[in-house]
């Protein structure tokens, strides 16, 4: 039936909707009698009256508990990586995404690439709200947010700094405030 013919049928008062409802499956009289008998049965009335609706909810709720993947209370996994190039850094990021702690030993890398690698992994660690800690010279610990990292040393470890062999180390001595560089012909801190 087209839209125009249906509109004409509505205006004329014809029985236009009977065609649509004839296709539906109605319950037979036997089925209706079975439903009435079930409702009127004294055994079923008492069972439904004595039932606690909260018991049904608790039974269903316990079956819907799903564990989170990657989290286990029994053990945590630590991945030790000794990369030789920056190309191996996505593996460390993937390990962090899988909630594994990563110890990165960068002693076999070129210092410039090692700095780049630490910056890359530190960015990934920051993105997942993780923690980073310098363990030793060119050795770093990166942990996901589900791992608590505590340090036994009283001083804070400097995050994401790779010392190089050719970098001179400067000391300001006992004076903690540096002297201004302007007006002085000789910089005592750099000589």
UniProtKB/Swiss-Prot annotation:
GO CC terms in record: cytoplasm
Region (Disordered): 151-191
Keyword Cell division in annotation: yes
Source domain of life: Bacteria
GO BP terms in the entry: division septum assembly; FtsZ-dependent cytokinesis
Biased composition (Low complexity): 151-165
Listed InterPro entries: Cell_div_SepF (IPR023052), Cell_div_SepF/SepF-rel (IPR007561), SepF-like_sf (IPR038594)
Bias-annotated ranges (Polar residues): 166-178
Keywords: Cell cycle, Cell division, Cytoplasm, Septation
Record's subcellular location: Cytoplasm
Family annotation (HAMAP family): SepF
Similarity field: Belongs to the SepF family.
Subunit relationships: Homodimer. Interacts with FtsZ.
Known function: Cell division protein that is part of the divisome complex and is recruited early to the Z-ring. Probably stimulates Z-ring formation, perhaps through the cross-linking of FtsZ protofilaments. Its function overlaps with FtsA.
Annotated protein name in UniProt: Cell division protein SepF
Organism: Prochlorococcus marinus (strain MIT 9215)
